[in-house]
Each structure stands twice: as C-alpha cells, then as structure tokens.
C-alpha cells in the first residue's frame, strides 16, 4: 500500500534530501572540484547528477568510486537496489561557478599561497571567463591576532532585488589554517545577455534605438493615406 503524503511534507522531504546529498558530496568530493548536485525523479528511478571539475576522479578506476557513492546514498536513504543512479557531469563554465572558485581558493590557501595573490588570481580568472562582476571576501585571522575581512572585487555587481536571484551565484567555504578558521565567500555575476534561461537583461536596462535616416525633403508634397479603392471611386467622373 502506497503511503499518502501531503504536498507540504513532500516539499520538505525533497528539500532535506537535497540538502543532505549536497552536504555529503561537499565533504566527500571537495578535492574533485565538486560544484553542485541535481536530482531528477522519474517513475522508475531517481537520477542524481554530480557536477564537478574533475569528473574522472569522481568516477574512479573502472567506475569504482561512483559505485561506492551510489551504495552509500542507497543505504542512507533506504532506496531499493537499482532505483537510484549517480552520474558525473563536468562543469561547463568553471570560471562562472562560484562553488568551483571557492574550492579553488580554499586549496590555494591550504597550499600556502598568499591571500592577496590567491584572491586576485580567482577574480582575474572569473572576469576572463566572461563574468559581469566578481567579489571575493576572506575573513578571519588574516595576519594579526585580531580578526578582519578583506574584500577583492572587479566589474559590476548588484546586491539587492530579484536580479540577485537570477544572475548572482554565491558560495561559502571554510578553511582551517594554522592561525584559525578562515571564511571564503565568492560572488559571481553572470552576463544577463548570455543567460540560457530566465531574463536576458536587468530590469533597469534601457536600450536606446537609433532613429532611421530619413530622405531630405526638397519640396512640399501631399501624401494621400486613403485606401486605393476610395481614391479611384472619387477620381471617376459621375455620369449625368
């Protein structure tokens, strides 16, 4: 017997499932450049698409790693064998993925690169990838004993309204350094004109169309805008 569930409970259950999956993959696939997950439910099975920069490492040798992840997810969420399938998909625009850049920044700092150099490297790479704007914020005990935040930004970036949801991609990561935990926040604004889905321009964008060139008027003239039939009927002489 199929258990009936209300719409509200279904939405909450789907949200919890997605959040748990995302957190699990964030921990497990950090080194593989994990940048998001998508869940597609079909009548026969549930498809989980893992987006990462290094898909070969996610798959593993002869698909061993992806099979291990499938078994873990299947056991945790009590799916029947064969009803949940995991796929790995390469991130198309790595420079426009905030999660991928936050992970990149994290590993740069762990490898001992200076904060300024790492942040400017990320900002430059994002802007070269065709972003409209980028902002990287690093906060924590950066040099002195007192915590502070450093902000690195370039281009055009909006901070409020519905366009933030449409065009801004945000990611937050934490990195454990010798002096303490540092917080990394990356915001990337995609070019609205290149957006595949949703609005193609900002709400306040105004496009000014250049007027067409008109022929110069050499002499005054009268243009008749009446229909041709009416003009012909008026032109015909009336017989007595």
UniProtKB/Swiss-Prot annotation:
Cross-link (Glycyl lysine isopeptide (Lys-Gly) (interchain with G-Cter in ubiquitin)): 106, 132, 141, 151, 200, 212
Biological process per Gene Ontology, one example term: nonfunctional rRNA decay
SUPFAM superfamilies referenced in this protein's UniProt entry, alphabetically: Prokaryotic type KH domain (KH-domain type II), Ribosomal protein S3 C-terminal domain
Pfam families: KH_2, Ribosomal_S3_C
Keyword DNA-binding assigned: no
Stretches with biased composition (Acidic residues): 230-240
GO molecular function: DNA-(apurinic or apyrimidinic site) endonuclease activity; RNA binding; structural constituent of ribosome
UniProt region (Disordered), positions on chain: 212-240
Assigned keywords, A-Z: Cytoplasm, Isopeptide bond, Methylation, Phosphoprotein, Ribonucleoprotein, Ribosomal protein, RNA-binding, Ubl conjugation
KH type-2 domain ranges (all copies): 21-92
Gene Ontology CC, one term: cytosolic small ribosomal subunit
Residues with Phosphoserine modification: 97, 129, 221
Outcome recorded upon mutating residue 108 to E: Impaired ability to rescue stalled ribosomes
NCBIfam families named among the record's database cross-references: PRK04191.1, uS3_euk_arch
Similarity-based family: Belongs to the universal ribosomal protein uS3 family.
Protein name, per record: Small ribosomal subunit protein uS3
Species the sequence originates in: Saccharomyces cerevisiae (strain ATCC 204508 / S288c) (Baker's yeast)
Gene expressing this chain: RPS3
